[in-house]
Amino acid sequence: MAVQQNKSTRSKRGMRRSHHALRSVTISVDRTSGETHRRHCVTFDGFYRGRKMIEK
């Protein structure tokens, strides 16, 4: 089992965790339906970049 040789400081711990923060999701509005959706994802209606991608 790995055991640290010296105590890590609060500063080093914080620097290591600096990339752990959650980022907000970017939301776009579809040109055709006006529906909001995540970037680079198909809307619930099946539209992506103004075109029908999925037939229901």
Swiss-Prot record:
The protein's matches in Pfam families, at most eight in alphabetical order, are given as: Ribosomal_L32p (PF01783)
- Please give the Gene Ontology molecular function terms for this protein: structural constituent of ribosome
Which UniProt keywords are present, listed alphabetically?
A: Ribonucleoprotein, Ribosomal protein
Q: Which GO terms describe its cellular component?
A: large ribosomal subunit
Q: Tell me which PANTHER family the record gives.
A: 50S RIBOSOMAL PROTEIN L32 (PTHR35534), LARGE RIBOSOMAL SUBUNIT PROTEIN BL32 (PTHR35534:SF1)
Q: Which family does it belong to?
A: Belongs to the bacterial ribosomal protein bL32 family.
What is this protein's record name? Large ribosomal subunit protein bL32
Species whose genome carries this gene: Blochmanniella pennsylvanica (strain BPEN)
